[in-house]
Amino acid sequence: MPFIPHTETDIQDMLAAIGVNDIEQLFDEIPSALRTGPLNLVPEAMSEMEITRLMHRRAAQDHVDLNFIGAGAYEHHIPAAVWQIATRGEFYSAYTPYQAEASQGTLQLVYEYQTMMTGLTGMDVSNASLYDGASALAEAVLMSVRANRKSKSHRVLMPATVNPVYRSVTRAIVHGQGIELVEVPFDPATGRVDPKSLAAFEGQDITALVIPQPNFFGVLEEADALTDWAHAQDAQVIGVVNPVSLALLKPPGEWGGKGADIVCGEGQPLGAPLSSGGPYFGFMCCRKEHVRQMPGRIVGRTLDADGRTGFVLTLQAREQHIRRSKATSNICTNQGLVVTAATIHMALLGPEGLERVAAACHANTHALIERLKPLGVTPAFAGEAFHEIAFRLPRPVRPVLDAMAQQGVLGGYALGDDYSDLGDLLLVCATETKTEADLDRYAEVMKAALA
């Protein structure tokens, strides 16, 4: 729709109504030193037709590279129906509605989403979503401190194998709240936390242990052993998981003897495209006994006065719009539109379809390993992987990535950017979107880049 600005008459009428002579008077209180000068670099106004031509010219400059980067954001096939349905007028909102019970369709969809997520994770309860995977982990840490009444230390063990961005965001959010994040090193041979390395913490007051599955290197952690160790210390277990991997892997609710206490992660692989970093959504599930400490909105099913099934926002006393000073979190909305897409995505795939996607991801990753072995490019860690793997290169990573990019292949993520001692390691992801020809192309371009 074309933008129709105010006329000069409109502007003068509005200024007269508020008792000022010109627009500049509205900004008198801002010191001149802080004001922005004339925007000389802004081009002259263009007509709608001229803007359309400009956008077509710029769009023609774009090209799509073959992408093998993962590191927390993954390229999956999204059925066309997902966003066609999600962007219908009935759904097209980022929020759960303010008059929630008047929007039964939206509430039912969120309820179905929560049901699907508890099924995937093996947990009892899911919320309606959080902002993203990183903030979901931070909220899980805060939640564990509230929920673990046996612990007074507020010490949370955070493995170095957790996504570096997640660790950074968590540090920022819990800063100043009396919570100590203790980094746990990983075994350089396996690329995962060795349960024996936790012996130094035995007998100490530990609030929670974070377990990424798979971890940032793509390696599967020994979740059962780590979970049992944490519970033996009266610590809670926070699982950080990839939802697609749960179609193949043991759900966190079944880890060890008792299962995880809180599960969170990034929901982007469930129907959200790679779009300059967002919008994504975070998910969180927990055991029923911890539900009153869970942040975010929760949709429940009930009966109305006439005995008909209905859906409501339940346990709202946890939320900041009810009792801000006692709320479990200051999150005041959620990623409802992306959750809508995720729900449709999971419904279209079904359990068998999601399992096929996960199996194809795993198969492609191992097929890529075989193609790279003759080049002297081998897995850096002995641990089993899901759909992402760290390779050790015979040459520095950054020049290799630059050379591959020039050939239209995004070769992976340089782990040296976040781990100074892993400068020769390249993190590569091959999802179900990669064909045999794509894998061959990757190996061909990698060979040329190493030459």
Curated annotation (Swiss-Prot):
Its EC number is 1.4.4.2. It comes from the Bacteria. GO terms for biological process: glycine decarboxylation via glycine cleavage system; nucleoside metabolic process. Signal peptide: none annotated. Gene3D superfamilies: Aspartate Aminotransferase, domain 1, Type I PLP-dependent aspartate aminotransferase-like (Major domain). CDD domains: GDC-P. Keywords: Oxidoreductase. It catalyses: N(6)-[(R)-lipoyl]-L-lysyl-[glycine-cleavage complex H protein] + glycine + H(+) = N(6)-[(R)-S(8)-aminomethyldihydrolipoyl]-L-lysyl-[glycine-cleavage complex H protein] + CO2. The keyword Oxidoreductase applies. InterPro entries: GcvPA, GDC-P_N, GDC_P, PyrdxlP-dep_Trfase, PyrdxlP-dep_Trfase_major, PyrdxlP-dep_Trfase_small. The glycine cleavage system is composed of four proteins: P, T, L and H. In this organism, the P 'protein' is a heterodimer of two subunits. This is Probable glycine dehydrogenase (decarboxylating) subunit 1. The lineage of its organism: Bacteria, Pseudomonadati, Pseudomonadota, Gammaproteobacteria, Chromatiales. The gene is gcvPA.
